[in-house]
Amino acid sequence: VPMHKRTWRLVATAATFVALTTAAVGCGSDGGSTASSTTKAGSGEGAKGSTLAVPGDYKTIQEAVDAAKAGDLVLVDEGTYNEAVDVSTADITIRGVDRNKVILDGEFKLENGIRVLDTDGVTVENMTARNYVSNGFFWTGSDRYHGSYLTAYRNGDYGIYAFDAYHGQLDNSYGSGSPDAGFYIGECFKCDAVIDTVVSEYNGLGYSGTNSGGDLYIINSTFAHNRAGMVPNSGSYELCYPGRSNTIVGNTVYDNNYLEGPGIDASLLAQGNGILLAGSINNTVERNLVYDHERTGISAVPFPEDDASDVPPPASDLDKPCDEVKDQDLPEKSPGFVLWPATGNSIVGNVVSGSGLADIAEGTIPEGG
């Protein structure tokens, strides 16, 4: 099944952001970051099933996953595994014995380290995925997903990625070296998901989420040295638009001015911003420490989409679950250029300093513009 590939279709340039009218306030402080640790995993019977050891019982992770039944634990020993693992058995756990010594390596040829496709209740933990053409760890069309103590670096799209997935948690994990986002949750409402205690650095975007929100919490995490830090956004190129009702609390976001590494076009547009609400509405941004950005610390700006397939939905549709709106008919005629608003956001109680344009900014478009 081909992976859904996200592309931001833009005609705007970085000058679009600079041209937006801004109103700024600021306050000073400083801070640092924390990194996630590694856990040691033991063998033995799973909580509800058996333990399948790799390579003791099965030579490859894929063979063990294919043999697993609900409730089983696939326990992976130290080593480098040149595999692209597809998971289609629900309610299993795939766990490495050592996060830094259990390595899935795509050798710049394989698509995804571990892909969970339309399968519920899959936990992946305590391992590393690197050098994949697309993603390190990927859940799509899945419910009750969990990724914990994971490292994903130098992958072609995303590090750790959940798409059209619900009731999930990504925690104590690290993402680096992705041209798109180190962490991404997209196309879900209400997502009922949390990103907690992660570190994302040296990516195009530290965090990105298109058309996602609703009980979606991004908390207690560090986003640093990316082209842009955190960028919830909207667009008709994916379903369930717009992005809305994210809760971004207690994060440390700093020095997202990275120039030398990989970056998709959208990350070039967003570069130099800490928390950028790009056409995303009704979000809560509170008690974050944000500092040292060449453009803005925290900003909410309209997002320009060229060749859009639809316009923003009416307010009466904003509380509808994604499943109720994703099959609605599109307009017979494409609306062409659409500007997604960034309204209704609550940005309070943050500590922001060292911003080149404004510590806190709101972008507006002149009437008739």
Q: For each predicted feature, which ranges?
A:
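Glycine-rich beta-solenoid repeat tracts in large extracellular/virion proteins
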Residues: 65, 84-88, 112-118, 135-141, ...
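Acidic, glycine- and Ser/Thr-rich low-complexity intrinsically disordered tracts
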Residues: 72-75, 306-369
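Short, T/G/N/S-enriched strand-turn elements that build extracellular solenoid repeat scaffolds
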Residues: 61-68, 81-89, 104-105, 138, ...
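Right-handed parallel beta-helix
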Residues: 97-101, 120-131, 143-158, 166-181, ...
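Bacterial N-terminal signal peptides that target proteins for export
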Residues: 3-14
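Bacterial signal peptide processing site
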Residues: 28-30
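Right-handed parallel beta-helix/beta-spiral solenoid domain characteristic of secreted/periplasmic
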Residues: 50-59, 73-78, 84, 90-133
